[in-house]
């Protein structure tokens, strides 16, 4: 079984996912998800997201990004814990 590089709490249609600043960067791998999702940054500094065939972009508190199902993407580690709100479509 593969451990996830985050902790997660789920309720209703949302997940709150927390990535620790102590996460090993090698755990933040390129991956795809089976469902489209809307991701909102609740807190975190210095983190970036990179979508397939795009340069990394900064992730700021309050940012919202749509990630289509089966699209490769990854996170790039920042300076603080990262907390995301995720709503799957």
Regions of interest found by a model, annotated:
Residues 1-19:
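Transition segment at domain starts
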Residues 14-34, 42, 66-69:
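Conserved short histidine dyad/triad with adjacent acidic residue
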Residues 45-47:
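Basic nucleic-acid-binding interfaces
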Residues 34-38, 81:
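Short, surface-exposed beta-edge/turn micro-motifs
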